[in-house]
Amino acid sequence: MSDSQPGSTSSTGGKSDSGYIPGDDTWTQWRNIFAILTGKMTDEGKEQFRIARDIRNEAADCKRCEDQRDYLLQYSPIIRFLSDNIRQLGGDLSSHNIYCRRCTSRKAGGFDPEYGILLCANEMKDQGHLEDTMAHEMVHAYDHLRFKVDWTDNLRHAACTEIRASSLSGECRWAREFFRRGQWKFTQQHQECVRRRAILSVRARPGCKDEAHAEKVVNEVWDSCFRDTRPFDEIYR
């Protein structure tokens, strides 16, 4: 028998060279978890484990996401405020066009002017994370209606709405950065978080050449876009 190729399955219990063992039973799951904890699973194996877990938990993840989405639409002050302001501009975001789905890329959500908001149910850590993500995407929706954002070709537009969404959604507040992302700074923390996340978002767009290009575009619009807190009177949280 020939040696197993990288990423292929060997003859020992289905285990691959990545350290990941396919299977949904409890024993196999524990073996995979211990392989991760002891450093015996490669990054490729960890990704295989994550994908299998997300597929296995898809129905439960989406149900939890939908329940939390509906609760936030009814009771969250920031979500209700953004919903009201979007409605005043002629838009409508509610459970019929805020979708909870399993995503294959590592992102929390997205906004599409034609279809609405996508929430990646398999990436949501808790209801607070879902609230931040909804608020972020709803700021994009507000900007689309209020400022006629060119999502396709204008990187300055993209940078501006990313700055505003990261700043106003709450995802860059100190507690979120400190406890979830391990950012320990006390001074200028909010601004640095907003800038970092805006650069990452712009960098991922097709028209952006590289990180230096993304940083340049963000810097060009930073002052005016960071100061613009509409529809809030100030940064809400």
From Swiss-Prot:
Q: Which residues form the active site?
A: E137
EC number, UniProt record: 3.4.24.-
Q: Where in the cell is it found?
A: Mitochondrion inner membrane
Q: EC class of this enzyme?
A: hydrolase
**Compositionally biased region (Low complexity):** 1-19
Q: Where is this region: Disordered?
A: 1-23
Q: Which GO terms describe its biological process?
A: mitochondrial protein processing; mitochondrial proton-transporting ATP synthase complex assembly
Predominant cellular place of this UniProt entry's protein: mitochondrion
Q: State any GO CC term.
A: mitochondrial inner membrane
Under InterPro entries, the record lists: Peptidase_M76_ATP23 (IPR019165)
Q: Which domain of life is it from?
A: Eukaryota
UniProt keyword list: Hydrolase, Membrane, Metal-binding, Metalloprotease, Mitochondrion, Mitochondrion inner membrane, Protease
Can you name one GO molecular function term for this protein? Answer: metalloendopeptidase activity
* Protein task: Has a dual role in the assembly of mitochondrial ATPase. Acts as a protease that removes N-terminal residues of mitochondrial ATPase CF(0) subunit 6 at the intermembrane space side. Also involved in the correct assembly of the membrane-embedded ATPase CF(0) particle, probably mediating association of subunit 6 with the subunit 9 ring.
The record's family statement is: Belongs to the peptidase M76 family.
Question: Could you identify this protein by its name?
Answer: Mitochondrial inner membrane protease atp23
What is the name of the gene encoding this protein? atp23
